Each structure stands twice: as structure tokens, then as C-alpha cells.
């Protein structure tokens, strides 16, 4: 059995190393270090998205084939798709919707196992980055900095995130007279 990221790694070796060699010749060795870095970053981020997607698909497949799942749940929808904005950019997540065999709430088991809310459109890491930036600058800038690609979190989402945070305020320290 191949490891969960086998295909992404093989594809990177076969295609992207050639692409990187081309970037070295066309950009770096012709004095354009900035262009080289941009091209390299895009390639590495694309690899990250591919890897992330393949790992999630592998986990979904493991869940689907597990004895626990077969005994407890039947597959209601085989391949629901959703887009998730991550630090690497948008990835497409394919997951099955399961119904308990003995009654109860339907569930995306993949979401449960990886700690994702079924309605999340943005990963926790991307939200954390957006929040970090928004605290220092603006909601818009926070949304732009959520991931390392051109994809953005809307400023409304960042605003809701910030306003939705419950913060424990320190007790007021009495002033000495």
C-alpha cells in the first residue's frame, strides 16, 4: 500500500523538478532572483495543495473501508465536494456523508476526525493568519494575508471572526490611594 502522499510526491519529482530547473535557467541564472522566488513559491504551494488534498482523500478512504464504519454507518452521499481555503490556497475536499445504521445524526466522518466543522470554508490555520494580520492592520489586509496565494478571506469573514471571539478580560486591579 502506498503512503497517503505517494502520488503527489511522484508527480512533484516527475513534473515539478523539471519546472524548477527551467526556472533556474530562465530566471535565476539570468539575474532575475525575484522572479525565480515567485515561481518557486508558486510551485511549492501547488505541491502543498496537492499533498494536503491527497492526504485528506486517503483519510476518507481509510474511514470508508474501516470495520467501524461498515458496522456503524452506511454511505449516504459518496462524494460531496467542498472548497477549503488553506494557507496553501484553495483545495477541493471530497468526502462521504454517512448515516448511522441504528438512527441518529448524519455526519461527515472525515470532518469529525480532522477537527473541521462541516460548514468551514476556511482552515483554522488560514483564519489564525488572517486574525493575526487583522489585529495589526485591517480586516481586508487580514483576509489577504490568510493564505500564501492570491486567494483571500473576505473582510466580512475576518470581522465576524474577531467579533465572535470571546475574550476573558482581566479583572480590574484596584488603584492604590
Language model features by range: what are they?
Residues 16-24, 91-177:
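Short, positively charged, Gly/Tyr-enriched micro-motifs
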Residues 1-101:
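Short, conserved DNA-binding cores of transcription-related domains
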Amino acid at each position: 500500500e502506498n503512503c497517503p502522499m505517494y502520488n503527489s510526491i511522484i508527480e512533484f519529482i516527475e513534473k515539478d523538478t523539471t519546472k524548477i530547473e527551467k526556472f533556474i535557467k530562465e530566471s535565476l541564472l539570468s539575474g532575475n532572483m525575484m522572479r525565480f522566488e515567485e515561481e518557486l513559491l508558486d510551485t511549492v504551494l501547488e505541491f502543498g495543495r496537492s499533498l494536503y488534498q491527497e492526504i485528506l482523500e486517503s483519510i476518507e478512504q481509510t474511514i470508508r473501508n474501516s470495520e467501524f464504519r461498515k458496522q456503524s454507518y452506511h454511505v449516504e452521499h459518496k462524494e460531496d465536494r467542498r472548497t477549503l481555503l488553506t494557507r496553501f490556497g484553495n483545495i477541493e475536499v471530497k468526502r462521504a456523508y454517512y448515516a448511522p445504521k441504528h438512527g441518529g445524526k448524519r455526519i461527515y466522518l472525515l470532518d469529525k476526525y480532522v477537527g473541521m466543522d462541516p460548514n468551514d470554508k476556511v482552515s483554522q490555520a488560514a483564519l489564525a493568519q488572517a486574525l493575526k494580520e487583522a489585529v495589526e492592520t485591517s480586516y481586508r489586509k487580514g483576509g489577504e494575508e490568510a493564505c500564501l496565494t492570491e486567494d483571500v478571506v473576505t473582510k466580512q469573514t475576518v470581522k465576524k471572526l474577531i467579533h465572535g471571539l470571546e475574550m476573558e478580560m482581566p479583572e480590574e486591579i484596584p488603584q492604590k490611594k
